[in-house]
């Protein structure tokens, strides 16, 4: 008997029990959506590495992935680069593999919860009756913040982080998610998929953040050719253009990025805070 949770719930729930009787329905193997992190092979989670070693099929985004990540796969793994495939073609590979009894690792840049086309792919898998699950990864903005040596939420400076992108050649933005609205909050702003519009964006954001607001651009964070640029909204576009960056970069804006910023102390660690109710 094999117990299967609903594919529509997104969990690959095979609970092994007694062997299935001859001729019984055998469910397809699972697809594992795996966050590949920002690129470095040693920034994958332990679970991600275990899945890559185990799965005989691996689909990966060749455009943004450090080839060393694929070194976690077994030598006999079938590797499929998805950068030139549409979603139907990608799904077809996954469905065929699972129907043949082969587990599939589907690598996603960064974390699958951000700009990974996860929803479109899982809907197709649900329609095909293929179970799937998700293994999170280190998002690109977190790797960028690490390289900058900064916290994005500094007490009494910024306690919110906005993760967004801008209107471009890609999917349209909802009307309620205009950049100007986010800028008015003056929260720490992280822009993905927007590096080609850096000059226009800097000008737009300066209206609320001010031209002297710290800004940074991190290209291919954690990878051998990574580039870190620091500046302000007044000059960050010049720095980006001088470096010739046109893709695979994250833009960060906000006072939390200010070097040596003077900030309040977190209440959580305030020495006068009453901790008598805490266990331990």
List where the protein language model places each region:
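Short, hinge-like loop/turn segments at secondary-structure boundaries
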Residues: 76-77, 150-155, 208, 232-235
């Amino acid at each position: 008997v094999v117990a299967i949770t609903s594919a529509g719930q997104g969990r690959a729930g095979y609970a092994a029990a007694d062997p299935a009787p001859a001729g019984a329905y055998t469910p397809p193997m699972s697809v594992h959506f795996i966050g590949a992190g920002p690129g470095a092979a040693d920034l994958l989670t332990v679970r991600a590495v275990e899945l890559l070693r185990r799965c005989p099929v691996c689909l990966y985004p060749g455009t943004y992935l450090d080839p060393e990540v694929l070194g976690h796969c077994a030598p006999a793994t079938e590797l499929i680069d998805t950068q030139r495939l549409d979603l139907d073609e990608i799904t077809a590979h996954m469905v065929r593999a699972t129907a043949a009894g082969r587990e599939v690792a589907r690598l996603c840049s960064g974390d699958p919860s951000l700009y990974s086309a996860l929803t479109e792919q899982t809907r197709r898998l649900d329609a095909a009756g293929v179970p799937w699950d998700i293994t999170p990864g280190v998002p690109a903005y977190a790797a960028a913040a690490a390289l900058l040596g900064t916290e994005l939420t500094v007490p009494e400076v910024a306690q919110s982080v906005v993760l967004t992108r801008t209107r471009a050649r890609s999917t349209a933005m909802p009307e309620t998610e205009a950049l100007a609205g986010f800028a008015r909050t003056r929260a720490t702003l992280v822009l993905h998929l927007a590096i080609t519009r850096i000059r226009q964006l800097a000008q737009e954001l300066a209206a609320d953040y001010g031209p002297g607001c710290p800004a940074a651009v991190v290209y291919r964070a954690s990878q051998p050719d990574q580039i870190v640029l620091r500046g302000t909204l007044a000059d960050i576009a010049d720095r980006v253009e001088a470096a010739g960056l046109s893709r695979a970069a994250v833009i960060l804006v906000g006072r939390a990025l200010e070097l040596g910023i003077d900030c309040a102390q977190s209440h959580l660690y305030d020495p006068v805070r009453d901790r008598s109710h805490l266990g331990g």
